[in-house]
């Protein structure tokens, strides 16, 4: 092989290498494509992170909304219960004078008179039925004879010396007290031993 053939072969090899590598513009284009793809990947990663953050915020908002809904429901149930108790308390308070009057009728009635005796028995049955009915709704009688004076349940009308009773003990109940579901509606009016 002569020099010319060698030169031609070398040129062909160089041309093949140039074609394989491509032009400088092709190299720049490839590099810019890689940069573009890297930028696109970074942009997509940022969008993914933003979407994940937004999803977390929305999940938190849903949880807060559920908690608020439960709180509103609990408050509403509590308000309904309070309204029911208040209405029952007010109603029971209005019934107390009726009970007092029935008890006074029994105390002042003539038990010796046969005609009055039958009437008093009817009043007593009415009173017992009335009291048992209101007890079903949580109303209880406070009749503290012999108990230690408790200012939360008793109202002292006066104090009196008594050798038969310990100091600060209820001797006499002037007017019975009543409580509804363990809440005093009317304290018992009492005389307390000194």
Swiss-Prot record:
InterPro entries: GrpE, GrpE_coiled_coil, GrpE_head
GO MF annotation list: adenyl-nucleotide exchange factor activity; protein homodimerization activity; protein-folding chaperone binding; unfolded protein binding
Statement: the UniProt record of this protein carries the keyword Chaperone: yes
CDD domains: GrpE (cd00446)
Entries under Gene3D superfamilies matching the protein: 3.90.20.20, Head domain of nucleotide exchange factor GrpE
GO CC annotations on file: cytosol
Keywords, ordered alphabetically: Chaperone, Cytoplasm, Stress response
Coiled coil start-end: none
Gene Ontology biological process: protein folding
Protein location: Cytoplasm
Assembly: Homodimer.
Similarity comment: family membership: Belongs to the GrpE family.
Free-text function comment from the UniProt entry: Participates actively in the response to hyperosmotic and heat shock by preventing the aggregation of stress-denatured proteins, in association with DnaK and GrpE. It is the nucleotide exchange factor for DnaK and may function as a thermosensor. Unfolded proteins bind initially to DnaJ; upon interaction with the DnaJ-bound protein, DnaK hydrolyzes its bound ATP, resulting in the formation of a stable complex. GrpE releases ADP from DnaK; ATP binding to DnaK triggers the release of the substrate protein, thus completing the reaction cycle.
Protein name from the UniProt record: Protein GrpE
Naturally occurring in which organism (per UniProt): Aliivibrio salmonicida (strain LFI1238) (Vibrio salmonicida (strain LFI1238))
Source species taxonomy: Bacteria, Pseudomonadati, Pseudomonadota, Gammaproteobacteria, Vibrionales
